[in-house]
Amino acid sequence: MSFFDYISKDEITALITDLISIESHKDQPLFESAVAEYIQNRFKKEEIETELEQTCPDFPRPNVYAYLGGKSKSPELMLNGHIDTVPGFNMDYPAYTPFIRDGKIYGRGSADMKGGITGFMAAFIAAKRAGLVFRKSAMFAGVTGEEECSQGTEHLIKTGYEPVKVVISEPTEMSLCTAHKGFEWVEVTMIGRSCHGSKPWAGKNAIYAAARLCDLIQKELIPELESHPDPLLGPGTVCVGVVNGGHDPNIVPDRCTIQLDRRFMVTEPLETVYAQIISLAQRAADEYGCKFEWRPMDHSRPSMIALPHAIDPNDDYVQSTLKLLEEVTHKEQEPVVWPCGWTDAGLLGNYTKAKCIVVGPGEVACAHNNDEYCSLEQIYQASELYFKMLQTYCC
């Protein structure tokens, strides 16, 4: 019997429709609770062992777990995906009223990443209905808060889960991703001296110092990064995303803060990332007679550093999964990398011994967009792929 004898495409479509319909983001009073409970109840209906686990003492932020082959802290295969989305914002259509057009399902989270969650659920349901005999355990981990600071996966790691293999279903258009950059957000504050705007020579203008730092980043740091790109991922990047300073036009500003996003490679130690920024900040501050403070923006990323991820493309796990992917997509496959973006593989691949790959339905380019959508055919392919992975690695 084929995969779709155990779960139909119509049933898979109903799953993704339900998931999109349930708001699960940081602006919801109960955050991801409703979608976590939906997933848990759907697994319970299939008599699949499942549980909710709160990740935060102050707010209802549950991870939802399910197990085949018995509960284990060291599952042979973990299907990991985040159940939160970004908010609906000003979408081109009602964000949580999904509809289908030209083989695509539209709605917030369709690509990022409820399409992938649907594939995981469908694979687990089909495996249970097929009566597969599990020699090794498999785990579904629907994690919370990835769009903020990955507290769901961080909690999973801190509570002792050590999977052997992990697949993360971020939208890769059903290509198998083996590497991506890490990221760090850094805040630099220039500290000058205020005075009346009519005599600017009596003060130290912190905005000028911050502007000089931005200039140095553009003229020196960015070209330096671009001069030695990674052969697969390209160069590291830096983006100044926030500038905040001053009070009134007639006051020389004594403080100006910039916040920047730095994407870095496995070959770039975090200490080097910091040192580059500190060196330029010191030069800019000195030129304008200012001082400066800097800090990693810890509240904007996991307390575990958002490290780069890379697995050897020739690893047995990668190569065997590529063969399964070719069976499902009916075309030759090669490993790919994400030149931009980040996934929880940066945590699971660095803070555990797990081998991590990223493969899922949808286009990352339309994630968070006002017309977010996901290909239904890719969701069906993902569902079948994850089922085959359960068979191959656990049965």
Spans of model-derived segments:
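Hydrophobic/aromatic beta-strand patches that form the interior of the parallel beta-sheet core
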Residues: 51, 77-79, 141, 165-167, ...
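Metal-dependent amide/peptide-bond hydrolase catalytic core
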Residues: 1-4, 14, 54, 187-395
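Acidic-glycine-rich active-site phosphate/pyrophosphate-binding loop
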Residues: 87-101, 178-189, 323-324, 357
